[in-house]
């Protein structure tokens, strides 16, 4: 059902600015689609590098948009020869911080000079694209900051400055990376219990006081306090206490997720806006046909997201562990998944042995996969989009966190939400085999699946009904923040 809450003659005009990585572009596009469905004119701003990459992956007309949904691009300041720059987060963040404000202000000026487009009335920006706040303040329009992390992950980042004040980061030397030190209890972050240093986002685990990401994130969360509001892709029932604790230290915080479920309720998938996608890789839809031939809960889905990389040895251990489990699996293997390799090569013996019980893909429609009845478990890096989509699909997880706030998400999946089993960072095929069997067939797996089903039901209630928490939060956000200037 498409609904519109805006009826005034002058449409509100929102400019959406995602961070240029797949895991940030997708949720921002969902926010843009929801606002479009509510009657907003939308301008979606990619970096020029990703704009061109999207044209290559989705076709020359992919970004034509339509009258009330337009695409623009700004340069990211990096040399054209920089290869796949989405893999170099610190470099991208620093370049954006230094180079993007002027071209962004020029886009806003150009939009506001047009007679056939309503003037910009609000901006939604990714949490790490806060240069846009300067432009919003200069223009006199509200800005909403969208942090694409979990609430628990964002809450830990909000307290990075205290790790420095308490002498917990940066580490004095490499010996502080030991298991013993990483088991240090962290009991002073509001609403977050039983945390250890190892559960905190990886950026604090540095010996360099000038670490780019640690200092960049401290600056960005501080700048977020200038926003009119903050939105999170989560739902109140899942992270209620943490969200409540944030309200006292930040502008109003609105949880409006899971966004993919909200979009499903608000937008007809067959419509023009429903069909619009911004995947940097081509999705292999054959995955769904293969899953259609499988029995319920019989297939393990394996995907480590769009940025995570591993060694060739880790890849091999995962492969042989999956083979030994004798379970059917769908494994997404990006060409750049292995560090230093342009293409992933799996052992021929592995390919031959598993040919009748696996499908390999370079990218897939993950939301659809995780809601498919054949999927019985998910081996994941615990990126937030993946974690939330798994919860929304009622799918339990094997957690292999790598960086950023993935360790925090893993901790909550395993200990707070009751839907995950953690697997060791030093991947061993025997452990992979054991954990896969336990998740798919064991008693623990059964309990995790029951708990995941509870979260699936609560996620649906938050997004499907008029009084669902995320439905109401989105309506409040629109009327109290986005439309406030137009009254």
From Swiss-Prot:
Gene designation per UniProt: UGT85A7
Annotated keywords: Glycosyltransferase, Transferase
Lineage: Eukaryota, Viridiplantae, Streptophyta, Embryophyta, Tracheophyta
Binding site for UDP-alpha-D-glucose: 364-366, 381-389, 403-406
Protein name, entry field: UDP-glycosyltransferase 85A7
Tissue expression per record: Expressed in roots, shoots, leaves and flowers.
Family: Belongs to the UDP-glycosyltransferase family.
CDD domains: GT1_Gtf-like (cd03784)
Residue runs in coiled coils: none
GO molecular function annotation: glucuronosyltransferase activity; UDP-glucosyltransferase activity
InterPro entries assigned to the protein according to its UniProt record, in alphabetical order: UDP_glucos_trans (IPR002213), UDP_glycos_trans_CS (IPR035595)
PROSITE patterns, alphabetized: UDPGT
E.C. no: 2.4.1.-
Gene Ontology cellular component list: cytosol
